[in-house]
Amino acid sequence: LKCHKLVPPFWKTCPEGKNLCYKMYMVATPMIPVKRGCIDVCPKNSALVKYMCCNTNKCN
């Protein structure tokens, strides 16, 4: 699986066991990602922070 880093088009190959790409952003500024990368389990959203997770190449 290949996931984008914070600034596309840069990406990295995920290590074994991290089978999701994710994008974390603040609810107040959804167009500005705070973090991107590979993750094993999609974190829960909170009142301030949301996560978008997906399992295809470079989908974050």
Curated annotation (Swiss-Prot):
Species whose genome carries this gene: Naja annulifera (Banded Egyptian cobra)
The major lineage groups are: Eukaryota, Metazoa, Chordata, Craniata, Vertebrata
Q: Which Pfam families match?
A: Toxin_cobra-type
Q: What is this protein called?
A: Cytotoxin 5
Kindly list the GO molecular function terms attached to this UniProt entry.
Answer: toxin activity
Entry keywords, A to Z? Cardiotoxin, Cytolysis, Disulfide bond, Membrane, Secreted, Target cell membrane, Target membrane, Toxin
Tissue expression notes: Expressed by the venom gland.
Which terms in the GO cellular component ontology are assigned? Answer: extracellular region; membrane; other organism cell membrane
Q: Which family does it belong to?
A: Belongs to the three-finger toxin family. Short-chain subfamily. Type IA cytotoxin sub-subfamily.
Q: Where in the cell is it found?
A: Secreted; Target cell membrane
Q: Name one GO biological process term.
A: killing of cells of another organism
